[in-house]
UniProtKB/Swiss-Prot annotation:
The keyword Lyase applies. This is Tryptophan synthase alpha chain. The alpha subunit is responsible for the aldol cleavage of indoleglycerol phosphate to indole and glyceraldehyde 3-phosphate. Tetramer of two alpha and two beta chains. It comes from Bacillus cereus (strain B4264). Pathway: Amino-acid biosynthesis; L-tryptophan biosynthesis; L-tryptophan from chorismate: step 5/5. CDD domains: Tryptophan_synthase_alpha. SUPFAM superfamilies: Ribulose-phoshate binding barrel. One of its GO terms (cellular component) is cytosol. GO terms for molecular function: tryptophan synthase activity. NCBIfam families: trpA.
Length: 258
């Protein structure tokens, strides 16, 4: 469990496809079924969003999914319960994407206890500044759960080195300035940014935000170690276009042989 399980997803040159699902969107049975599907389809890690009323980093698709979940009465405890149940059936690593507020409202010690029980391997907290990460970092380290760092295009390299120096799991490299969502293409400077991050950190680097096509996936995994696909996966799951998710996974894995 934990850090080692995430490491294994990148071993021997593996490229990681990390889909994002919103916890409780469509109900808990649907969450469990979607995790089972993604596991069987060959995803490397699954990222599960904790819905929050003020999701500052999320684009419209993920915001809508979070609102649907909250409007239907989804709770953090309910998401953990669903993960506890589905964990008995799947081995895929779980990474939670949560804003800081739900963690503190739930109680950080209680939150981490539930993470352990649900077999959560890593956590991403997009609104937790590096300077304040000890709010939960030391507690997570004690129980071998990775606190995944985010770095952005605007982060100076010194800051990237600082942010990632004590981190575990992988580095989440945000590939656009702004919020998540589907985009047509990526600017040339994104390539040099990813190459720069890769050359300065000792962890796998995963690109995320705005990745939505096979071409995007192929472009990104040529440079880095994997991709997170969020808004597009939510759209495809909503529209029952699961074959297209399998195609994105295949595009990722194809680059392992390259």
């Amino acid at each position: 469990m934990g850090v080692e399980k995430i490491k294994a997803a990148f071993e021997n040159g593996k490229k990681a496809f990390i889909p994002y699902v919103m916890g409780g969107d469509g109900g808990f049975e649907k969450l469990k079924e979607r995790i089972r599907f993604l596991d069987e389809a060959g995803a490397s890690i699954v990222e599960i969003g904790i819905p929050f009323s003020d999701p500052v980093a999320d684009g419209p698709t993920i915001q809508r999914a979070g609102k649907r979940a909250l409007d239907s009465g989804v709770t953090v405890k309910g998401i953990f319960q669903a993960l506890i149940e589905v964990r008995k059936e799947v081995q895929i690593p779980f990474v939670l994407m949560t804003y800081l507020n739900p963690v503190l409202a739930f109680g950080k010690e209680r939150f981490i206890e539930n993470c352990i029980e649900a077999g959560v391997d890593g956590i991403i907290v997009p609104d937790l500044p590096y300077e304040e990460q000890n709010i939960i970092a030391s507690l997570l380290r004690e129980v071998n759960i990775a606190l995944i760092p985010l770095v952005t295009v605007t982060s100076p390299i010194e800051r990237i080195e600082k942010i990632t120096s004590e981190s575990e799991g992988f580095v989440y490299a945000v590939t656009v300035a702004g919020v998540t969502g589907v985009r047509q293409n990526f600017k040339e400077e994104i390539h040099s940014y990813l190459e720069k991050v890769k050359s300065h950190v000792n962890l796998p680097v995963v690109a995320g935000f705005g990745i939505s096509t096979k071409e995007h996936v192929e472009e990104m995994v040529t440079i880095c170690d994997g991709v997170v696909v969020g808004s597009k996966v939510i759209e495809l799951l909503e529209n029952e276009k699961r074959e297209e998710i399998c195609e994105l996974i295949y595009a990722t894995k194809q680059k392992e042989e390259a």
